[in-house]
C-alpha cells in the first residue's frame, strides 16, 4: 500500500534517507515535498507520535536531516530545506492518520471520479481494512458513511474547527510546550493554513 507522505520518485528517495534520521530522534515524517522554482525547496513536515512538536525540535530535525543529505547528496542543484509541524489543519498522509483523527472534519480528494465526484467533505469515521471511512451529506439532513480505498486518494486534509483547535491545545498542554498566544492568533485567522512550529529555512 502506498501513502501520501512522498508522491514522486525523488520524494520517495529523499524520504528513504530522512525517515530513519527523523524516527531515530523520536519523531515521525508526516510529509515530504521537493518543490521546484528558481531555487528548489525541500519541505519536510514532522511531528511527535502523540503530536505537539515545537520550533526547537524542528530546528534539531533540520540540523540532523541536513547532515544526512550532505552525505548522500541526492539533490544536484542548490536547495532550501524547510522543516515545520503539520499545522492544525494538517494533511492526512498515512492510513493510520484517518484512524487517529476519527470524529474530526476533513476534505478528501481522489485521483479518479467516484460516483461522479473527486472531492469529499465530511466527518472521518475511522478505517476498515484498506479503506478510509467518511460520513458525508446525502441530501438534506441525511448522511451516509462511505469507504474510499486509501490508494485512491490524491490529497486529504483536516478542516479547521473549534473542536480541532481544542484538541491541539490539549496536545500542547500534554507536551508541556503550551503557548496560548499561538492559539489566539490562529482563532483570529481561522480558515487559513497555519503552521504551529516552523524552523527558518536552511540553504544548501
From Swiss-Prot:
Acidic residues bias spans: 181-198
Cellular component terms (Gene Ontology): cytosol
GO biological process terms, semicolon-separated: ribosomal small subunit assembly; translation
Keyword vocabulary terms for this entry: Cytoplasm, Ribosome biogenesis
Pfam families: DUF150_C, RimP_N
Region (Disordered): 176-204
Similarity comment: Belongs to the RimP family.
Protein name listed in UniProt: Ribosome maturation factor RimP
Taxonomic source organism: Cereibacter sphaeroides (strain ATCC 17023 / DSM 158 / JCM 6121 / CCUG 31486 / LMG 2827 / NBRC 12203 / NCIMB 8253 / ATH 2.4.1.) (Rhodobacter sphaeroides)
Gene: rimP
Amino acid at each position: 500500500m502506498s501513502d501520501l507522505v512522498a508522491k514522486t520518485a525523488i520524494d520517495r528517495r529523499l524520504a528513504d534517507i530522512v525517515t530513519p534520521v527523523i524516527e531515530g530522534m523520536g519523531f515521525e515524517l508526516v510529509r515530504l515535498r521537493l518543490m521546484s522554482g528558481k531555487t528548489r525547496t525541500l519541505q519536510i513536515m514532522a511531528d511527535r507520535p502523540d503530536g505537539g512538536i515545537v520550533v526547537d525540535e524542528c530546528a534539531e530535525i533540520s540540523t540532523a536531516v541536513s547532515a544526512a543529505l550532505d552525505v548522500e547528496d541526492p539533490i544536484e542543484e542548490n536547495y532550501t530545506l524547510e522543516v515545520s509541524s503539520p499545522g492544525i489543519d494538517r494533511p492526512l498522509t498515512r492510513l493510520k492518520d484517518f484512524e487517529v483523527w476519527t470524529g474530526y472534519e476533513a476534505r478528501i480528494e481522489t485521483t479518479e471520479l467516484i460516483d461522479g465526484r473527486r472531492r469529499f467533505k465530511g466527518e472521518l469515521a475511522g478505517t476498515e481494512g484498506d479503506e478510509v471511512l467518511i460520513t458525508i451529506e446525502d441530501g438534506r439532513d441525511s448522511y451516509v458513511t462511505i469507504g474510499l480505498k486509501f490508494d485512491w486518494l490524491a490529497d486529504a486534509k483536516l478542516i479547521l474547527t473549534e473542536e480541532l483547535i481544542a484538541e491541539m491545545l490539549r496536545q500542547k498542554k500534554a507536551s508541556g510546550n503550551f503557548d496560548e498566544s499561538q492559539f489566539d492568533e490562529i482563532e483570529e485567522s481561522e480558515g487559513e493554513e497555519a503552521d504551529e512550529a516552523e524552523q527558518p529555512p536552511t540553504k544548501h
